[in-house]
């Protein structure tokens, strides 16, 4: 067993994961503040603008799978640092675009590609340092997704509205900052040595009087992807992500349509982001204390209700912020609960590959949710139908996560 004293302090991977996920949060979750400026300058429809965000979410989500495989094989450091360079290039180039197709390539493809490489390796690495608090470690590593959007929403709005600046400066300034953040996050990230465990930690013993446990092993990637329960989790992840990303992609636009000012709508985005961040840590704590399945199902059910309540409450700053907080809480919790569930079901050995494949559901939902929301809004003139569809998917997700139990352990 590796000597505990020869390794880095185990809180370091948590901070590096936080920094990396904050970078990804800045990339993705404040996109709705760009809707009005891009519409005003270019006359693009909501669906056309949402397509850039949808492509970014798709590429981001799909890229996590090869990023996880590469992280398992060659370590997380090179993967994250390469992603940081690509993200910075794509974001900065987005400040020079003159057509929607250029934006689709720079922001959607290049920045999304880089973001996907940054996101997954820290999530797969951090829990390996915390076998005694895996869900909590996962939650802390991903809390930056909410923190990044909490920072980016008002910051981007301030730059956009500042005389002599505008939306292009957001891409330029923030692109440089995000690249630096990702390079720092990747430069020091590494998994623990083989056989390492924290000082004083002893794996839980079986209950008194229980039969001697059989020797078990973790599931391989090939075994996990052949398990029916894996694909039930995949479907549930798609349902929850579809609803959450639809709202994130259109929340500020919904608020502006309801008569709120740009800063008030951005405030609702920040409320969602703050809740999105807080739940990633607190949900991990709840899971470590009370278990995952019932808590998971309750959150899906609550998000279903919030998707419907937005039409009654979304016309005021306070009402929209309350709904945003609820949606942000439940959406953000998924990014603690799904990796923790994947880890619980299939073990840590192939977590990078297993969760990388599972996370592609979020990428597909990220493409479908914002674009479908924008297209239905343009077609019907209201967000009623897209948000109702999202509520139905959340209800389906509730049933799936409540009924899906861990698979049998593999025997060595």
Swiss-Prot record:
Periplasmic side: 41-45, 96-99, 161-167, 258-261, 314-316, 381-382
Membrane topology, from the record: Multi-pass membrane protein
Effect of residue 256 to A: No change in transport activity
Effect of residue 256 to D: Increases transport activity
Cytoplasmic side: 1-10, 75, 130-133, 188-227, 291-292, 347-350, 404-412
Main location: membrane
Mutation effect (residue 383 to A): Loss of transport activity
Record keywords: Cell inner membrane, Cell membrane, Membrane, Symport, Transmembrane, Transmembrane helix, Transport
CDD domains: MFS_OFA_like
Subcellular location field: Cell inner membrane
Annotated phenotype, changing residue 145 to A: Strong decrease in transport activity
Activity regulation as described: Inhibited by the protonophore carbonyl cyanide m-chlorophenylhydrazone (CCCP), but not by valinomycin.
Source superkingdom: Bacteria
Annotated transmembrane regions: 11-40, 46-74, 76-95, 100-129, 134-160, 168-187, 228-257, 262-290, 293-313, 317-346, 351-380, 383-403
Protein's name according to its UniProt entry: L-lactate transporter
